[in-house]
């Protein structure tokens, strides 16, 4: 279900993040992703994003496939702290599950079992800052929900997801726009701002907080990553003007 189609020359680099355009299609390309499914998919996407440390720059959820422009940053050289591991786990696990992991870590620490503590950390951090792990977690979580909801079994996605590396700068801006224009090309809307299951639609209509803020941060990063700009939603109004022209 999950594989990297092209490996970046910066993979595991401590200097430069990698941007991927990821695509996956429903098996037989059936049109099964309706409103409820797209809302749930977006929810899982944000959950996995918050856990993994990867960031969604742009996305579009269609009726039988999706596009995600994903930035995969290098793992921090100093590692991920125990507190940060637990905070991120809270994005995908229940409070009870996170508390159990915290107790497991504390017991190992109290016993001076550094090797065991390292294994516990690695069990979770190996799933962070990694394209395949991000996609695996997202697709599996959504498939489980979809199969349970629709009383079905088996795979939902057609073959393996596809991914290609996108350079920062014009290539990243152009790819973000290409993704946001999917519903326009499909004749579903005339204005990409009207399509709520896309990064641009969410950035315009989602407000200044929550996922609306996340969408704005991602598009600011996609448009200005070559200038060293991070995920800064305060620059959205300025970026939105130039991005709208690109659209």
Regions found by a protein language model. Give the residues of each.
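Short catalytic/metal-binding and nucleic-acid-binding patches
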Residues: 1-247
């Amino acid at each position: 279900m999950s594989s990297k189609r092209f490996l970046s020359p910066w993979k595991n680099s401590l200097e430069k993040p990698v941007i991927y355009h990821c695509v996956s299609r429903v098996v037989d390309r059936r049109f099964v992703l309706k409103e409820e499914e797209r809302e749930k998919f977006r929810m899982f996407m944000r959950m996995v994003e918050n856990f993994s440390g990867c960031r969604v720059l742009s996305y579009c959820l269609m009726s039988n496939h999706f596009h995600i422009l994903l930035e995969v940053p290098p793992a921090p050289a100093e590692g991920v702290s125990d507190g940060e591991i637990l905070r991120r786990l809270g994005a995908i696990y229940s409070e009870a599950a996170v508390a159990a992991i915290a107790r497991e870590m504390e017991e190992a620490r109290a016993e001076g079992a550094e090797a065991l503590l390292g294994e516990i950390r690695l069990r979770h951090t190996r799933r962070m800052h990694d394209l395949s792990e991000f996609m695996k977690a997202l697709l599996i979580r959504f498939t489980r929900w979809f199969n349970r909801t629709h009383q079905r079994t088996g795979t939902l996605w057609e073959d393996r997801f596809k991914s290609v590396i996108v350079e920062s700068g014009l290539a990243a801006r152009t790819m973000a726009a290409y993704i946001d224009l999917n519903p326009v090309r499909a004749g579903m809307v005339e204005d990409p701002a009207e399509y709520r299951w896309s990064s641009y639609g969410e950035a315009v209509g989602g407000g200044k907080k929550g996922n609306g803020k996340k969408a704005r941060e991602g598009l600011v990063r996609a448009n200005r990553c070559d200038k060293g700009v991070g995920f800064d939603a305060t620059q959205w109004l300025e970026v939105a003007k130039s991005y709208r022209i690109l659209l």
